[in-house]
Amino acid sequence: MPDNAIDTTVPPSGTGCTDCLAASGWWLHLRRCVTCGNIGCCDTSPSQHASRHAASTGHRLIRSFEPGEDWFWNFATEQFYDGPELAPPQHHPLDQPVPGPAGQVPPDWQRHLH
């Protein structure tokens, strides 16, 4: 994995998908850009903001932002990697619901997944 694409000093942009929160959307799982810290939603989520961020910025490396997960993914090679410790926090708050955010998830949320 190219280390120059990883900035271990940049904190996450927040505790939820930046774009979903701006548009009153919702997500299933969260991903963290390891270049700029942007938090986006996974490809199973309705809006797939993490991969859209990678495509629009060229920031191809992400890390899971889920509790108990520390894997990295490269959108260019479509491979998992191990990577360095990033600036805290390592995951969204433990009391944050999945899917989230609270109050935005429709009752039939499973039907909207990819």
Q: What does each model-found stretch correspond to?
A:
Residues 25-34:
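Canonical RING-type zinc finger of E3 ubiquitin-protein ligases
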